[in-house]
Amino acid sequence: MASAADDSALGGQEERESFTIYHEGRELQLHWRGLPPLQRFPASRICSNAGGELLLLTTDHALYSAKLQANREHMDLQLLRTDVVDMDFCSGSQELFVVLTNGSVQRQATGSGRDVGHPHAWQTLGFDPLELHAEGVRIRRVCCSAQGVVFVGASGETYVMGSCGEVFKAEQQPRHMRLYEEGKELLDLAAGNEHFVMLVAPYNLADDALQLSVASAKEEPEDERASVKSISSGHSERSVAANTRHLLHQGYALLHTQLFTFGASNNGLLGSGDHIRRANVMRLQKLDSMGVCSIAAGLEHTVARTLDGRLYHWGLNNHSQLGEDVSSPMEITITENTAALPIEQNSALEATCGDYHTLLLNASGQIHSLQPAPPMRHLQQSSTYAQTLLQLQLGAAWPRQLRLLMCSGGYTLQNQRQFQRQYHYYLSHLQSQLQLLLKHRQAVQTLEIWQRQSALEPLSALGPLLINWERILCLLVATLHSLEGFYRADFVQPADLLFICHYKEYIDLFDGYTKAYCDVFSVNGFGEAVVAITGLSSPLAELNEESYVTRLFQQPFSIYQLFVQFMELLVRTQSEYGEHRVAWSEFARHSCISQELAVNTKDFWSSNDRNPRIVQFRGRHRRVILTSALVPLKLVTSGISRSSNSFILFSDFLCQVSGNSLYSYPLTTLWVWTEGDSLRLTTPEKSFLVSTRSQEMRKVWLDQLQSSIIASLGKPLGSPVPSYRSTGYEFSREHPKFSRVKACGTWRKGVLHGNCYLEYPDGSVYCGELQHGIIEGFGKMVIPTTGLYVGNFKGGRFHGHGVYEMHCKDSPESEVYEGNFCEGLFHGHGVMRNNRYIYVGEYQANARSGYGVIEDLVSGDKYMGMFADNKRSGIGSCITNRGDYFEGSFSGDDLTGSGVAVFENDYYYEGELTLLGPNGRGEYYMPSGDACGGSGAMGTGEFDDTCELIGNKMFGQLSGTWDTVRIQAGELVLNRRFPKYPSSLGRQVVDHNRKWRSLFNNFESDLANCTASTSSSGGNQSAGTLRKSSKPTLSTAQIWNCIAVYMSKQRAREGTKPGNYFNNILLSLPLPQKTSSPLAKARTTTSALSKLQTEAASALDFLGFPPRRIQSQEALNSKPGGLQRADSLISMGHNTSRDLDNSSLASFQLDQSLMNSTVNGDESSTFNESFSKLSHNNNNSISKHMNNIDCSITSTTSTTSAVLDQVPSFGMALVLTEQDVTSIRLYLEQAFKDRHHPLYVLNERIANCFHYSYGYWKVKPTPILAKQAMREWESISRRIYRFVRKMFPALPEELCQMEGSREVISHITLLYPLVLSEGIYSTLFVLYANKYSRKDEMYRQNLNLAEKLKDQELVELMGHESFLHNVMLDPKFVESVQTLKELQEKFSPQDMLTVIQRSTQLLTEAYEHAMAANAAQLNADNMIPLTMLTMLRAAVPHLGAELALLDDLTGGPNFQAEMNGMAGYCYTTLKAAYEHVTSRALQKIP
């Protein structure tokens, strides 16, 4: 279809036709009957019936009937229908078949003088009478012989009708019949009187033949099975790899086309070379893989054309159409005098067949008749179309090119085109290149067979080159197909040419071929292959000549030169293709340089073939760039050198030959710069000076070294040599720090600096940061027989916050420590978990020392107090698994001296005691009831701590056990009154401000050091020693600077995926090409590290890493040197043991390619194969510990707000304003939710401590802890607030009341709504619920009864006024009940008070609405009864504990304004209602 641009190009000459029709050699004038088409479309098919009428189908699906007028100079065209995609005429049955746009087929008989196209004469054919296809059968093509018809479906399936010899007979209706093999695509179909010819191409068979990797589903979103489809880049979003694959698939399919024939008789019509009749379809093997691109058939002969311009014909010569009978395809020429004609007239662009003649369209646009009949003879000299004809862009018609020449009966039709004749030179020369490659393809295929079957190394080395040669051949075929379409004007934009729109893919393929060729040529591979061939029986004598084999593989280099010339011509008129021209020119230059280097390298190896020390470096992938023999270079030494030094610059390393020693320095880890008149060369293990004789020579060496380094790093030529690089290296055995360590990471002038990956000879692995060659910063270390550490390092040792998972082969226990380290030891706040206990608290030099909480997982006992030297020492409290509570002074892990003991049955003791029983003077109280009478108070957890009990008392010298207390010297008195709890209770517990001191100190120290670590050098070890250090004092500006650096580091560690920091490090590491071994035994050599595959990162996922089997804490303490040596990389696991437990080895998962790859070019130096996938579970896993939401104050995470990305300006002045308070609250709300912010981290750590202290109860906790937990939480909140004040100095030190409002600002009002999360509140609530269980049990029983009663019954049972029932029916009352239910979902005091106040307000509105008729106001007499009813309907669980906890949270001056106002009144009313409800048990009235 012509585009709008084409219309404008017509320039008002719309009467111009897009095709010309000839009859018996004369051009006819076309007359359009009726309204002629506004836009002329080319013809796609013509056929003539028996009456001499011509049927013409155009590309716009219009079918015309054309009749020759009597004067034989004019032809009338009449439109029949506009929905036809294909048509053909069967001369035997006199029927016209048309394929419609909807895929259906209709036929019409045209004999007996009937007019073609009568609307009522069409008959629709059925292809699926049984309706087996859900969507029906869609036909796209029809082809007719004299008696038979073949239909082709949209999916390539074929149907037959009529008769064709023994193949199919007398089919009255279409029948499905497979005419060609499965897995092939039908490209074209032609028919004579008694035979059919099919052109087919294979589907994607190129994957195996060309060794192509199968593209992923993402790269191929659409079905591309049809291998010859267009892949124009203008309509493709595939990746480069996918485009390359499709290019080669298209070329492979076009090259490996096949011809199939079948017919009623043979007589040479089938091209089989004989006259034997065939009862089935036959393949013409002679034309296999010849690149046949089009076919045409006359009544008794057939013509085929190939992409390289060759023609073949066969058939009968009854009418002199062939010159002689030809029963097998024979190549023909256009003219006998080819040399005298221009080259455009010497190549056939298209061939077609009339009934008994063959017409050719040459590249000049001239029609030639091949031995034409006399009436057509003058066409041989004429019919060259004008250059001003309409240009057409067919779009969907390409690449199945529209036929430019068609014949039927005595008519010939030529679709007019304006050929791109200025580019014919390139078309013809590419055809010549294809002919040459096809001519020598047998030799290549012979080498391929030998290469696969022979074990000879010279032949095996040809494998990559042979594959690349086949790829270039397929690429050339696809290129010719594209260029021919452009030349014929099937498309007119040069951007649609494959070698332009896919120039990157083309250059990659040619670059691959160039490399494969140079790899073979540089090591004399062709000569060695010829020598190997001489021992084989070669069917081709030329393969015994090295010159022939070399020329054979040099031939493809002529192809891209034509592309360069084409681009040079193109940019003269269309400068927008300058980028493509530059790309092709640069590639041509680089290819020439590569070939020149290959020649030089071959000469170098030839001249040194008797030097074994040099020959060992000989490899296909290595080139010789420069030698000191060519350009002198010598080593600068301080003394007199006794041996001479020579240098050889290879493409991947610099070789130094010194006497009997030989050294190699990989270019990826080589730094070079000018130093005076010399050159300074620096490697990870050595730095030395070299000099030249002149400045020019020094520049040559400097330029070659720098360009070689750039090339080895994979950077574009001309890039500056980077001082920072990401590459790999294996240190030699002599290196003092990293002996035999394989390192891959960021380097700066020979020193590791940045993110790195280290693998040690004993299997230890480190992944993380290094500073100036020292492990310092954040990282992960896996140590066989010792454990796994993730955290901060300093000076090569654990330092700062980290997680250390220890394991031991001989111990079944597991142990994980998370906390602070100092100089490789547990020091500061930490959490130790193993199978026997959990400890949370302070450490000093690997020992528990200071305040801590330890829970015995075996016995269930919990201790909260002071430690010294791993033992309980100092004041503390112990809670047993029975719920007994001990408080006093501990020494040597036992309770000694005076203390108190409160037992689960409400007995208690004051005096000298141990954990086992009384031990000296003391008093033992045994209550039997409360002072009010009855024993109901026993064990109920009465909420009134001052309640007095009645019971017996023992005092004096007491002994025995707690089960049997004995009086040694004392008295037993009966029925005495005494308080419920000991008077000295709580006097010997650790001060709440002393608890978790190290946690806050470590937090502030880590925050202060995060900026110091970025600016300090690797050798600075002054900070962080085991000596007690002063608490860092930072100004407000310094704190904000530390917060910014901290958040930046946290985000960098997390990367794009949470917990994937180490994966991102490995993904950022280089993947250089694998190199062969230059020195397999000399460990002083170094070269490029082999590929580090990204699959290794899967084992570095910190959050998903399970713990290992480890040694106990006691075993660790028995070996203090294990974490205290000067270099933790040596101390942690670098032992001599080789008997490692692979099942529990903490290691990295590396794939097989990494295991087998080389380091420093040593093929025997592979990565440790013991690195296997870690996949066993443990209850103490790090992942569970890090993601324990129960321990989290703020379990929700959110994206970083813009508020956190800048230093705030509010809260910094001396005066605090309401706007400051609002902004501070907004900032803190975001900070406590953002996992990158230090406040979030502080929250997480302190929440863990609080939960370990007052959570994890296996039995009902003692109510004594309720008040202690509340006071401890207040202390924690106050210390968090103290740090927040450093961020916002305007905040008050204690509290203040805002001017103009009653709002109080303090740590409670500011932080409780943010940090008092579900986890903390739930922990406190459990303690309070146990303490206030008596009233809540009564409350629960009354709720159960009230739930069963109707509203009226409940009012009567409670003894309230009956009119309150009307209030309960009001919707506001129901809303009040629902609001009060929200109390159990709130955690902060302010939110809880708001819920209570809102519920009371709705209750008031319900009363006023219900009593509106009486205009009654709600008073105190009715408020409490209504509140009781609301409470019983809301049924908030453990309401007594909720109210008591709220009472403690709102105590003090912080909520004085609220408690003195409406919120306090509502709270007091609810509390009073609760007391009324629980004062007695409700009983249903009978």
Swiss-Prot record:
Disruption phenotype: Deterioration of locomotion in adults with climbing ability strongly depressed.
Domain of life: Eukaryota
Biological process terms in GO annotation: early endosome to late endosome transport; endosomal transport; melanotic encapsulation of foreign target; regulation of Rab protein signal transduction
Membrane spanning residue stretches: none
Ranges for domain VPS9: 1333-1486
GO molecular function: GTPase activator activity; guanyl-nucleotide exchange factor activity; small GTPase binding
Pfam families, sorted: Alsin_RLD, DH_alsin, MORN, PH_alsin, VPS9
Keyword terms: GTPase activation, Guanine-nucleotide releasing factor, Repeat
Tissue distribution of the protein: In the embryo, expressed in a wide range of tissues including the epidermis and the ventral nerve cord.
Residue spans of the MORN repeats: 744-765, 766-784, 789-804, 817-832, 839-853, 863-884
InterPro entries in alphabetical order: Alsin_GEFs/MotNeuronReg, MORN, RCC1/BLIP-II, Reg_chr_condens, VPS9, VPS9_dom_sf
Stretches forming RCC1 repeats: 147-201, 256-307, 308-363
One GO CC term on file: cytoplasm
Record flagged with keyword Repeat: yes
Protein task: Has guanine nucleotide exchange factor (GEF) activity towards Rab5. Promotes the exchange of GDP to GTP, converting inactive GDP-bound Rab5 into its active GTP-bound form.
Protein name, as recorded: Alsin homolog
Taxonomic source organism: Drosophila melanogaster
Gene: Als2
